[in-house]
Amino acid sequence: MVKQRLLNCDIVDLLHDGRGVGRINGKAYFVEGALPGESVEFQVTTEKRNYGEGRIRSLSITSEHRVEPGCKHFSRCGGCSLQHLDHQQQIKFKKTQVLNSFERENVMTESLLTPINGSQWGYRRRARLAAQRAKDGQFIVGFRNAGSRRIEPITECLVLDDSLAALLVVLPQWLQLLPTDITLYEVELVRADNAIAIALEASRRLKEDELKDIRESLQALGEPPIQCWWKVGKNGQFRRLDEGADELYLNVPGDLKFRFKPGQFIQVNGEINTKMVDQMLRLVSPSSSGVAVDLFCGAGNLSLPLAKQFDQVIGVEGLNSLVAGAAQNAIENEITTAQFFTADLTQKNSLNKIKEIPKSLDLVVLDPPRSGAIDIMHWVAKSGAKQVIYISCHPSTMVRDAKHLLDAGYKIKDLGVLDMFPHTAHVEAIALFEK
């Protein structure tokens, strides 16, 4: 075990995860809770040969951009990491992260877009909570402590949608209705535009006679309507327990309804998602009306708005359930120009097997996970698409993938940052490539 000790240093930068960076005799220390421009005393928590880690104890010089965190759980909850930094400075930090990622690889852009931002509080329409029954039978519900498996009991969350935040107060008591032999693994709260969903991942199914109290109690939780969904184990499928149709929906730009189930991917920040879709549509060439391919399409978040402009849209996703959801969303929105296919986008030749993709493309859109799209970038680069729009949640993999496009003769026309997750170090970016 490392002997804990106190050190002092000046903070000169922010690391990608929001920790302050200081140096002592040339050795870097990453200090949780510290900001550039500050002189801090910190407790060393990790000591390696090339670097150290620590947690701030006190300040002798304070940054002009430091603010009082709004949440009483900040620094213990593993959710937010930047509530102590002024929000506009958070956006500046994220913009710098994206630009530095590109500049390190000598990749330049012709134009910088104005950062897309919105409400800094109450923006999350989805949360995954840990839950555990204590020895006294009461439930502990909250988020994991930063760097730990311990659950931090949460009674408020300022970044959650107000209706979800209100549930945090009553949720532990409501869970007491569950049979005592059931182990609860995770609780997902989702705010759709028509209802709230409480989705529970548990160790076994509920029996019919155990459902009565659950169903009746949902009505007592008030408005908006609350649905209860249930699945057994991580590999199970969510099924609705209460009376009603199996549907949740979100409104997306273009007067479209996007239906989904708990467990399926949605953008958690509805306001920024709307602005992101609008940004994407503005970046598309006004003369484009032919064929667009949407890779990592999910359940159609980008495909369906694109279908309003293009003669043909082809969406590709790795999960059958999402592809089925996208196809159903197209039907329900009376869109006949969109087709959806399942393909493993971590396999290099997967797209060659989809014969329905024409040889002449106007647009390719990618919105991959953090790991990026390295396995299909050769296909994208050789597709001949006039435009490529890449939406990324990890700037480093975005730059790596962008090199394939640059080598094929594309240039970055526009680059911008989306503040999808205020008060966290999470960075979202959008880039337009053209030939």
Can you annotate each of these PLM segments?
Residues 189-205:
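Carbohydrate-binding surface patches
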Residues 41-43, 128, 293:
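Hydrophobic beta-strand signal
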Residues 1-73, 340:
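Terminal RNA-binding accessory module
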Residues 2-8, 13-16, 205-435:
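Rossmann-like S-adenosyl-L-methionine
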Residues 57-69, 75-184:
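Extended interfacial segments that mediate partner engagement and assembly in macromolecular machines
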Residues 20-25, 142-145, 326:
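Short, acidic/hydrophobic/Gly-rich beta-strand patch recurrent on exposed beta strands
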Residues 113-120, 186-189, 233-237, 417-420:
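Short, solvent-exposed loop/turn elements at beta->coil junctions and helix N-caps
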